[in-house]
Amino acid sequence: QQLELGCNYRMTDIHAALGLSQLERLDSFVEQRHSVAKTYFEELKIDSVVLPYQHRDCISSFHLFVLNFTDSAGPRSQSEVFNRLRDSGVSVNLHYIPIYRHPYYSAMGFERSHFPEAEIYYQRAISIPMYPNISEDEQSFVIDVIKSDTSKKFEMPKGFQDLF
């Protein structure tokens, strides 16, 4: 949450050097993310879920994988799936919290009613784990939780990474 107006601090030389060293691995990272995204696209074909749109002339780096839940989501609503993933130990996020919901901007008089489309998106979208080294078992676990009946309880198997 943004409580007050802040500054945009620039990165240090050390951070720049680290970034440059990571560029050598960029193609590998993107390739791994594409593999993860391919599995999500294949496994999450659910009527109530809209998967990320990819134009045929563009190549995404998939820094996020956002699921957008439709009005007809029923038991697979955004909040239900979000809570089931979180309760199961999976790190799931809302991307992005609209600016008018942050205390700094709401105090300036910005209201939800001023931005109905942003509010709809916020209430329907979640980001699921997307990183190059997610294991097949971890990704399968995420998929199973999303596709499951809402009454089913999940516990993360021992040995899963703390990156969740």
Model-predicted regions and their roles:
Residues 1-164:
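PLP-dependent aminotransferase class I/II
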